């Protein structure tokens, strides 16, 4: 093989890899959207869940004179969410071996979501929706103490709710 053939082969492999990656990402996103719509249709059939045009949250809806903003956090059931401070939410895949010195797997757009003040007179409720579920949601209270976060806990202006807890969450916020 000469250098031209190698370049064409490498370019083809890169192109095929990119197409495969974006195809899989599109399928996963479509399935997640479908699952979210099903959860909300079962929980709140009267609301119209709209996809957001914003980059840092995915959905919004109006219910009982409140505007709900939803940031979706895709999770594995065996991982946990650790809220280290207002702007750093990280996924922990190693439940027993995690330390504060562990390199975090941070969620993007958290600062923008937490600091967002929409131009509305309605009360705004921000929800971080964990899809489909996670092992634990914990937050650091200080350097050494942590607390388990419940769906009813307002943490830095955001409710952290697992999709399996969504049905029990809404009666508590009305």
PLM ranges: what are they?
Residues 1-56, 61-69, 73, 77-83, ...:
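Surface-exposed interaction regions that form or flank ligand-binding interfaces
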């Amino acid at each position: 093989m000469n250098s031209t053939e190698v370049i064409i082969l490498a370019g083809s492999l890169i192109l095929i890899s990119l197409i495969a990656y974006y195809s899989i990402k599109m399928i996963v996103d479509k399935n997640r959207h479908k699952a979210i719509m099903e959860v909300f249709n079962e929980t709140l059939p009267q609301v119209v869940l709209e996809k957001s045009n914003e980059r840092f949250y995915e959905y919004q809806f109006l219910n009982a004179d409140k505007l709900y903003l939803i940031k979706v956090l895709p999770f594995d059931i065996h991982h946990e969410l650790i809220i280290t401070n207002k702007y750093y939410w990280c996924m922990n895949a190693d439940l027993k071996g995690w330390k504060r010195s562990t390199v975090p797997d941070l969620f993007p757009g958290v600062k923008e979501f937490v600091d967002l003040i929409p131009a509305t007179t309605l009360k705004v409720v921000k929800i971080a929706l964990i899809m489909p579920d996670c092992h634990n949601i914990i937050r650091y209270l200080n350097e050494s103490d942590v607390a388990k976060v419940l769906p009813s806990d307002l943490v830095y202006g955001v409710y952290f709710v697992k999709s399996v807890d969504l049905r029990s969450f809404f009666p508590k916020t009305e």
